[in-house]
Design a protein with these regions (language model features):
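Short, charged/polar N-terminal "headpieces" of proteins
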Residues: 1-35
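A short, surface-exposed beta-strand/turn
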Residues: 35-48
């Protein structure tokens, strides 16, 4: 999908579920009805990959942008898809975090 066709990409928020955490986005495109896209993250991935809950919305946003770049009229982005360990690794490469902070240094 050409980025210029999206007039607005809006983050709707977090929706905790029993088996996963959902992150909702709404896409508004010129001359089309708004689309709801939901990305899901298995809660176990947060601990396993040291992913902070505060990072998850941006991770989902970045993954959605990648999906939208490869979208075609014949193959639209799925309205629901999962974030994988591979997606987290890719995000970490582009957004390194400071691991040197110690828990005891917080007041």
């Amino acid at each position: 999908m050409a980025a210029h066709l999206i007039s607005q990409l809006r983050y709707l928020g977090v929706i905790p579920q029993t088996e996963y955490v959902e992150y909702g986005f709404e896409i508004e495109e010129k001359d089309k009805d708004p689309r709801l896209i939901v990305l899901m993250i298995d809660p176990a991935l947060f601990k396993k990959h040291d992913l902070m809950f505060q990072e998850a919305p941006d991770l989902c946003y970045q993954k959605l942008l990648l999906e939208l770049r490869s979208e075609t009229a014949d193959l639209p982005v799925s309205p629901r898809f999962s974030v994988t360990a591979s997606d987290i690794a890719h995000y970490r490469e582009l957004h390194p975090t400071i691991k040197s902070r110690k828990i005891g240094s917080r007041k």
